[in-house]
């Protein structure tokens, strides 16, 4: 299995990415292709690691402040070269660089799966249950039609079933209430269409994402990104509050010591790094979009994520799902009249 890793554009430079690749190679068997500035990368690559990876040199990359359309023009940029390698035989690509450039090039260079109108970013959210919830779209499509959300539901369902091995995953539609009548026009129309699928649970509220009420939560990319960023902010704030309170007294420190195992589990469940990255579903190869601030652990987990996606043949499974399930979507006649 060949995995392409974009070295450029991340917040903390090439070192965390190289360390993540090195750790993953210690635990999994795969061929790594590193794309980026050789002069910046070489000082951090040991002789042992150098014998295990292929290095494709380029100094150009899409900076975070640049518009995503620049990636289409810059054929020597790291993400463009990486996407070309993926298109021409590699199995997966991971990038912690410009997410818009990654999404745009993936769609243009790899192509969309037949029947998919818009690819979506799929992310894992912490849950009180034993398994995380799947949320999509997490930011690829800010303005959506009901048909797009149907695509997201199908792709999320297949990802949960194939990659995460969830039995009979349930899909919920994010709304401002559980009742069928709740939601804006997009939610109401999507709800009518999703009724055609057995996996559809119904509307869910924001709090349900973390309760394990459903396995997959579907929403437009604007709302999904707000949910994602809010979750990250709340988790960070709670962590800071805990640290400050623990340091406030000897009694608190002793109590924290006794609860260390519980705190470790909490940290693991809420740490973005443990989830790796966010798969871009709906294109013809496996692409993982990692957080710009990714540390070595996040890159390592993103590689494991990519391996699982390739081994489960999730792209093929999504293709088959769209061939067999999507044509069955229709709004019930009574609902059409009501609308």
UniProtKB/Swiss-Prot annotation:
Keyword Cytoplasm: yes
Localization in the cell: Cytoplasm
One cellular component (GO) term of this entry: cytoplasm
InterPro entries referenced in this protein's UniProt entry, alphabetically: FA_synthesis, Phospholipid_synth_PlsX-like
Pfam family name, one: FA_synthesis
Listed GO biological process terms: fatty acid biosynthetic process; phospholipid biosynthetic process
Catalytic activity line of the entry: a fatty acyl-[ACP] + phosphate = an acyl phosphate + holo-[ACP]
Keywords in alphabetical order: Cytoplasm, Lipid biosynthesis, Lipid metabolism, Phospholipid biosynthesis, Phospholipid metabolism, Transferase
Gene3D superfamilies assigned: Isopropylmalate Dehydrogenase
UniProt pathway: Lipid metabolism; phospholipid metabolism
Superkingdom, taxonomy of origin: Bacteria
Entry keyword NADP: no
Enzyme Commission number, as recorded: 2.3.1.274
UniProt GO MF annotations: phosphate:acyl-[acyl carrier protein] acyltransferase activity
Subunit structure: Homodimer. Probably interacts with PlsY.
Similarity section: Belongs to the PlsX family.
Purpose of the protein: Catalyzes the reversible formation of acyl-phosphate (acyl-PO(4)) from acyl-[acyl-carrier-protein] (acyl-ACP). This enzyme utilizes acyl-ACP as fatty acyl donor, but not acyl-CoA.
Protein's recorded name: Phosphate acyltransferase
